[in-house]
A protein has these predicted regions:
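Sec-dependent bacterial lipoprotein signal peptides
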Residues: 1-19
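Aromatic- and Gly/Pro-enriched helix-to-coil junctions and flexible linker segments
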Residues: 19-118
């Protein structure tokens, strides 16, 4: 009986641990030097700053991502990265679309880590 109980506890613990998100993953940005104009603007313009979303007179959630300055500000405070990584406590973005590719998320993360150069 004790073996069965121990086995059940171990299985439950493994299931719980496998369901947790690792939000503190480190991205290796060695040799990656994205800039806003070359790398980030195309991502934002295709996935975020589109009609009805984060652009225009009334951008979604009051967050305009249509210019370098606005994207930099939102990125440096963590909002953009949390949303595109689908972290808990943040709205998963882009809304009603597939999650951005790992490559695009890595570009954004490395861009932020390097100070968000234009």
């Amino acid at each position: 009986m004790n073996r069965l109980f121990s086995a059940v506890i171990i299985v439950i613990m493994m299931v719980i641990m496998s369901c947790s998100k690792d939000e503190a993953t480190n991205v290796d940005c060695t040799g990656v030097a994205p800039t806003y104009i070359k790398d980030i603007a195309p991502i934002m313009n295709l996935s975020c700053a589109v009609s009805g979303c984060h652009t225009g007179i009334f951008p979604a959630d009051g967050l305009d991502l249509s210019t370098y300055i606005k994207v930099k500000s939102a990125s440096l405070n963590g909002k953009v990265l949390q949303s595109i990584k689908h972290q808990s406590g943040a709205k998963a973005m882009p809304r009603d679309a597939a999650k951005l590719s790992v490559d695009k998320i890595t570009k954004v993360e490395c861009w932020i880590q390097s100070g968000a150069p234009e």
